[in-house]
Amino acid sequence: MAVTIDYSGKVVLVTGATKGVGRGIAQRFADAGATVVVCARKPADDLPADWQFFAADLRDGEAAFALIDSVVAANGRLDVLVNNAGGSPPVDTSTASPRITERLVQLNLLAAIYCSQQANHHMQQQATGGAIINISSVCAVRPSPTTAAYGAAKAGLNNYTATSALEWAPKVRVNSISAGMIRTEQAHLFYGDEAGIAAVGATVPLGRLALPTEIGDICVYLGSPMASYVTGANVLAHGGGESPAFLSA
C-alpha cells in the first residue's frame, strides 16, 4: 500500500508565503490537498486563485493575533501554522542601528511568538489539536557573520519551539526546521551569478542548495499524523552542513 499524506479538510496558514521559501511550503501543502492560507504585508499578483490571502505586518502583536482570529473565523479551524516570515539583509554587527536590530528581532522571533500564542489558543479547543512549525536557520546554531541579530533571533526561536512544545502538549505539537542555504528567486543577491551559486552549493555535502519545496516537504510531514510522536524537535535541513574549512586548506 502506498503511503500518502492527505490534507483534505485541513486548514494551513503559512506566513510570509507570497514568494521564496514560504511560497514553496504553501505549494506543497496545496499539493497535499490542504486549504492554504498565506499572509504577507503586500499581496502578490500571481497567487493561485484557491489560496486565501490576508495582509498583515506580524511585527505588530495585535495584528498577528487578529490574523489568526481572522483565519479561524473564515475557515472554522486552523490545523497547521507555519511561521515562515523572516529574513535579514547583510548588516555589519558592530554598526547596526538599534532600529535595524529591533526590527530584525521583531520579524524573526516576536512575530512567530505572537502567531504561535494565538494559534495555540484556538488549537487547544479543537478535538484534533494542531501543529506549529517554525522555520529557523542554521544561523541559529553556528556563527552568523553579517546576520548576527538574525541568528540570535533564530536561536531564540529554537528555544521557544522546545519550550512551547513542552507546555502545549499533548494537544499541540511544535517543531522547528533549521534550514541551510536555499535557492530562492533572490539567491543571486547573496551568492552571485550561476557560477557563484554553484560554487557555494559545492561546499555542501549534497552538492547544491535546497529548493523551497524541499523545505515544504518537511513541513508537510511535520504537520501530519505521520509525525504524531514528534514535538520539540529541530530538524536540520542543510544538505549535510557546510564542509569544514580544513578540507579545503
Give names to the regions the model predicted.
Residues 92-105, 196, 200:
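Substrate-binding pocket helix/loop in short-chain dehydrogenase/reductase
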Residues 2, 142, 231-249:
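Short C-terminal tail/terminal secondary-structure segment
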Residues 116, 153, 161:
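Active-site helix of classical SDR
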Residues 11, 18-19:
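Conserved glycine-rich cofactor-binding loop
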Residues 176, 195-230, 235-239:
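C-terminal helical subdomain
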Residues 121, 165-170, 228:
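Alpha-helical segment proximal to the catalytic Tyr-Lys
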Residues 137:
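Residue(s) in the substrate-gating loop at a strand-loop-helix junction
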